Amino acid sequence: MIHRVLITISLLVTGNLLASTTIIAIDEAFERGELTQDELILNKVYSFLQPELLDARFRGEQTELIKCGTPILIQYEAMQSDLAESTITIIEDLLSPRTDGLRETFFSPGGHFSFNYATTGTGAVPSADADGSGVPDYVEWAADYLDYTWAQEVDSAGFAGPNHVGGDGFYNVSFESMGAYGYCTTSAVDGSELTRLVLHNSYIGFGANQDPEGNVKGAMKVTCAHEFKHASQRSESNWSEGGWVELDATWAEEFVYDYVNDSMLNFMGSGDPYSHPHWGLDHDGSGSYEDYAWEDFMHQRFDGNSYVVAPILEYFWNWRQTHTNQNVMDSYAQALTQYGSSFPEAFGEYVVWNFFTGSRAVVTFGISQFGYDDAGVNGYPTATLATTHNSYPVSSSVTGIENLGCKMIRLNTSGQLGLEIDFDGQDGVQMSAMWAIRQDDNTVDWGSIDLDGSNNGSIVLDVRDATMAALIPVVTQLTGSTYGASYTIELNSLAECDPGDINDDNNLDVSDLVRLVAIILGNGAIPTDVEMCAADVNDDDQSNVQDVVTLVDLILQ
């Protein structure tokens, strides 16, 4: 039983580290029975805190950088009661605040944070002190960024602040040379604090971001927002959400420092809703960093894209305080219901937003006109298409859609009037068939095809003024395996008519009846679009003797 539980936790952490080859290799070795649980967690902790101690099997040519060490430490905490004392001692020693080098303490101007930093040794921060304050600029930056993060996440948005009662009365932060942006830990806390934060001591050599002040400041900013949100989560619900805490902390980067776009540039491209839209939001058992667009959608759609408040996500975390054992997706559904929507309805809109990003973003003068406010920002990913249709009629199908996943189908509309879609989704699954039309005036019309109990339905899209359209089958149920759908798309003339008025003279008489019979028998001139429309008198998508009977009844009325 322990082995099975550990595998589950390991899979969540693997997803959270965005396919770190080292972490994946460690997990796979454990699953093959080649590592004990103690060796598993030791190697994971070594991977970012002391890579030279890694088992030789997991060492690469260069040390891998991970986004966040917190999920590994959450896993360590969950396993702790089953670990050997020697293992705990090693890890606690690695997590203990550093004492080497000449060390100083600085208190943030906002009065919330205490920073312990070294000016000499391997963990020293950069020594530059441009303002001559006697405190390294690097430490002052961190203080400013965390003060601002507190103001945004706690004072403004209403998320819980970290518990830092007792001790020195400040929330403690330190700096380390390590293989992660940072981490939040429950080890070696001061007084009755729940957690403390550790930031990288230089952020030199980290991935590029879009902070106008440079990559170093940008990396520090998003780490402050991210790790501080972990501290808030711990106060809210004791990290009961598993890997979802990483999705939420990455969203916090967008909420606090939206212009930096570090995660967008460095942690997309593998398993996210753009590179793998057919993968479920909870692929491998949990959401993670790369899925932060889900909370970004919830916030922008239901909170008016405020960078001051975030009511729907505040509600979500308040709810989690008393529902720590509830499935996280059910908690999201509860929040959506509270804000006048439902999970299936919101998730259908979410995948439409995801279609119009990157090269398909709807942008005018650099401003997004639909969906995410940064959908057209340089570097924002473009969702992968299952296929593109350029000519019609066409019949096709899609498979391999996981629960909470979709397939995106582009419909080119050049020179077309209407497209008639007949959709046949797999039976026995909660599914939607979303459609969208990008008009040539840079507006987007979208909706869903009305499906019956067998997931069948049809719609005619007016694409006369469209630059493109989309069909997006999406599985909205919370659990399951993989599913599929088939569809047929035909041209539609969009002809307008009055049923039975074959001659289009606003009268129903014998001349209409004669022409109807000729059309059914294939006699006379080829019928026009209006005639074909009017010939379907009983609106069953075909013209036959039943239409003759119906027209006779109408004439005799």
Which residues fall in each region the model found?
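Sec-dependent signal peptide recognition
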Residues: 2-8
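Cellulosome-associated attachment modules in secreted, modular CAZymes
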Residues: 494-557
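Active-site-proximal alpha-helical
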Residues: 272-359
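Beta/coil-rich, acidic/histidine-enriched accessory regions frequently appended to metallopeptidases
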Residues: 84, 322-496
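Zinc-dependent metallopeptidase catalytic helix centered on the HExxH motif
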Residues: 198-269, 273, 285
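Zn2+-dependent metallopeptidase catalytic core
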Residues: 21-194, 200-228, 232-236, 432-438
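N-terminal signal peptide c-region/cleavage motif recognized by signal peptidases
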Residues: 14-15
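Surface-exposed patches in mature extracellular/periplasmic domains of secreted proteins
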Residues: 155-171, 234, 238-244, 263-267, ...
